[in-house]
Amino acid sequence: LKCKKLVPLFSKTCPPGKNLCYKMFMVAAPKVPVKRGCINVCPKSSLLVKYVCCNTDKCN
């Protein structure tokens, strides 16, 4: 699985066990990602922070 880094032009191959790509952003600014990368379990979103997870190459 390949996931985009914070700068979308770059991507990285996820290590074994981390089989989801994720994008994290502030609820107040949904168009501006704060973090991107590989993760094993999708974190829960909160009132301030939203996570979007997916499992295909560069889907974040």
Curated annotation (Swiss-Prot):
Cellular component, GO annotation: extracellular region; membrane; other organism cell membrane
Example GO molecular function: toxin activity
Keywords: Cardiotoxin, Cytolysis, Disulfide bond, Membrane, Secreted, Target cell membrane, Target membrane, Toxin
Tree of life domain: Eukaryota
Disulphide-bonded residues: 3-21, 14-38, 42-53, 54-59
Alphabetized SUPFAM superfamilies for the sequence: Snake toxin-like
Protein name: Cytotoxin SP15d
Gene3D superfamilies in alphabetical order: CD59
